[in-house]
């Protein structure tokens, strides 16, 4: 992962540990599939980030449900692809497709009547292309852009717990997960103290050799990610950069900015915007306007009815979270432009969105 995309070795190691532990404990999900039948072949095109986690989450659920699992890799991760193909080679239910362009792999899945379920990810244009082919599958899953996932620090937020989460979740793996934070709306009464603590916490966020266990941000080797960073930084208006950063080819960030209004764009990479909010209600209102309602986190007590509004609007809602890596058994998925499922029911294509459980989705009721 370090050689392919610049992922820090510590992060890649934790991903592997999470994946292995998830697969070892799949027995807890047996009730989700008991008495149900498999679809046949489940296929997936892995993104460049966290392929081991994808293999465990999607592949583990597919196999548990009695399906065959066929998967391909991002062109950005050739070394990872070869290694993972070797790992699954002894298990005939897993079929790793190495060296095939993802466009051709996707076309092959559309034409193959054995492939009943397909997982894809990418920008909205990718989702639109496959949506036109939804009739070829029983289910089509699309993980779209997560945009700039927000976190709110309400007026009574416990800063001792909130600040480490905000900083580490923003810059984990160089901000190259769809679940990494990009915007923090902070009540103005605690903004100065929160900013002070965030700046102190930033001392641990190092840019450097991915082989160094202290590195948080390795080289950003994916050109598209760097282009998204450039676009977001160019869109900033009235922003103040709070820490020194790098913009030298593959070496990027960390970009910690204070701004009255972060750009609402698709973004990957080491970026976090701090924005003061006049009240808890204002922070909620601004977050609810997100273009990509993928994930929202908050600390402190929200105004009455807020959590319900978040659950209606966003795919995932984290209430005073206490983890660094997202637990793999939490339901996963966005809403609106950030993700959907197209399913064939009684001859009709039905669209739905929101977080889902993989094992429950990969068997027929």
Where are the regions that the model predicts?
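Conserved glycine-rich beta-strand-loop-beta hairpin in the small C-terminal domain of fold type I
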Residues: 215, 248-253, 264-272, 289-295
């Amino acid at each position: 992962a370090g050689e392919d995309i610049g992922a820090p070795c510590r992060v890649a190691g934790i991903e592997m540990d999470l994946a292995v532990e998830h697969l070892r404990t799949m027995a807890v999900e047996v009730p989700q599939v008991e008495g149900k039948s498999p679809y046949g072949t489940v296929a997936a095109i892995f993104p460049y980030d966290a392929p081991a986690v994808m293999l465990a989450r999607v592949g583990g659920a597919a196999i548990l449900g009695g399906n065959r699992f066929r998967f391909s890799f991002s062109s950005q991760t050739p070394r990872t692809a070869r290694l993972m193909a070797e790992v699954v080679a002894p298990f005939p239910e897993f079929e790793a497709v190495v060296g095939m362009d993802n466009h051709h792999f996707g076309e092959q899945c559309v034409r193959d009547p054995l492939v009943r379920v397909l997982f894809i990810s990418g920008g909205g244009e990718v989702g639109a292309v496959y949506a036109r082919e939804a009739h070829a599958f029983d289910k089509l899953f699309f993980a779209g852009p997560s945009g700039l996932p927000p976190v709110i620090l309400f007026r009574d937020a416990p800063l001792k717990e909130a600040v480490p989460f905000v900083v580490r979740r923003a810059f984990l793996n160089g901000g190259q997960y769809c679940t990494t934070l990009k915007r923090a709306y902070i009540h103005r009464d605690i903004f100065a103290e929160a900013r002070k603590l965030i700046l102190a916490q930033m001392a641990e966020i190092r840019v450097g050799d991915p082989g160094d266990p202290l590195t948080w941000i390795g080289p950003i080797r994916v050109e598209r990610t760097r282009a998204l960073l450039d676009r977001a930084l160019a869109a900033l208006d009235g922003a103040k950069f709070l820490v020194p950063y790098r913009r030298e080819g593959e070496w990027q960030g960390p970009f910690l900015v204070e701004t009255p209004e972060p750009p609402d764009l698709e973004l990957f990479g080491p970026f976090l915007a701090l924005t003061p909010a006049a009240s808890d209600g204002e922070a909620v209102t601004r977050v609810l306007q997100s273009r990509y309602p993928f994930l929202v986190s908050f600390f402190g007590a929200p105004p009455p009815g807020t959590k319900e509004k978040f659950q209606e609007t966003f795919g995932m809602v984290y209430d005073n979270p206490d983890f660094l890596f997202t637990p793999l058994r939490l339901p996963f998925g966005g809403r609106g432009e950030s993700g959907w499922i197209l399913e064939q029911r009684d001859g009709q294509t039905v669209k739905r969105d929101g977080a889902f459980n993989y094992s429950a989705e990969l068997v027929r009721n």
